[in-house]
């Protein structure tokens, strides 16, 4: 009789089944099989917060099949993912199948390769009850907050609303940033730059005014001051008074953890956190690679550990030496400090290729799209982390002109090191530092141009998915498995919307945030939430009781809820409408954008006297190739975005391909984007060009 091995997904089952062979039957639970009921609280608060788990709707048949398979097999091994959620799935499966959770029937795989599966199968263990309790505590806390807060929001804001323990903090962070920008008062300053070049030499460069000649720092704050300095510099010689040379070593970034992978994929490819994790899950669970069969290409992707296995480091360094040469290999074992608060969180490695010797060029013959992009990113980042530093020769020049001191700096790369393979993407558009021409102390320079540019200090930018995830991580909010769901949830609930990658609160999100800030300050307090996460980590480490942790929170929360009911008795928060420049054709009043249960729509501001309304459509700025109408964003019945002409039904042109701002160089029509290329849809044009990779 074979042994039954249960994993979460069919893809994972297929890969593991290939390695285990005939003595095992591998099947999938399709994720969680039990949870708290959707229609009731499902927690006995008066009896030690005992959960009332039920089989998830639609999973009854699957559970029945798993029980039947278990009876036909010689034992069961639970091989769900190596994290809290995976441990919880295994605990529930053990409960359903009548397995002893303290028996060695739990196996985990940090990587789904022949070696990784063999290693996992060789070390079966009991279910980690502390890990399960941490998951159970998080689930109950989220249920208690959501189930108790939602009815309150229904009464005070709008029916159908809900609030979450962690999501509410994320909305607050986004709203705080918006208010910071709204209240920002810019300060004027001026940059005074001299375009110089050595007398009789080639190679001009720019130096910036930095101080007075005696070294006192100088800040130019208005035009009058700037004009005075320009006048004082008129006719002055520019002489190099000091040259400083040095060497600068740039170290590579550490391998990815969940948060940094999501941030980098967002910056590099515009991926949402959910899209990144979907592609990473595929790479972890296994894909068919020519010459290798079905193999998991990366280690487990939900981690905040920077630990790397010694054998993976060795394999990477061997490949680096063969590909780039021995001088490109880092000669020491780099160690990075993980943010992990507990040993339980540091159980995994960082995200790395399971086979460092398998470069993206070989893999991309078998995979494409998101998975190919993400594998190249993960492979490159990990390999770079095992490469030598980039070494730069730096030069800094101090230049005196009259009573003022200018400075210029630059560098030349003397050894490219890890940058031969990888450069980390960034959100900041930093000024690029370039090399200076050969310079000597005492040298007189020729002034080609002197400019004074007015500038103003800038507010911090709106959050993107990448920067919000960074802020959540920096503040200790959420954990690797929660970053993507947090963002998905606040967008799906209509509290936040994306506008050109920027995250903005909606009027509904602002109204809910106001209520939360005024009535439930602890729930949206960043430090309080971070402390709660730490307490749950302590539960995970087996150093605190999960029931007491929940009770300590719930006692205070219940009092806040009672007080909020008193504070807002008879009151209701109005969700502000968004004004438009559209006029109601029925009564002449302005039309406004309202938020309803099913999203935004345009309605007459004279409601309820005038009930004129229509769906909200977004204009892409592109024009229809058939009749010149506006190309609008629309959604299919299944929620898929497509683009259609504003003159529908007179014109029924529609496409799944996104219109872009760039115009056709041949006929001036709107271009559309499809699978790595831009094309013109105007009949008879036929223009097509590949999208350049950045």
Positions of PLM-derived features:
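Intrinsically disordered, low-complexity regulatory segments
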Residues: 1-139, 220, 426
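Short acidic, hydrophobic short linear motifs in intrinsically disordered regions
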Residues: 240-243, 252-265, 292-300, 459-471
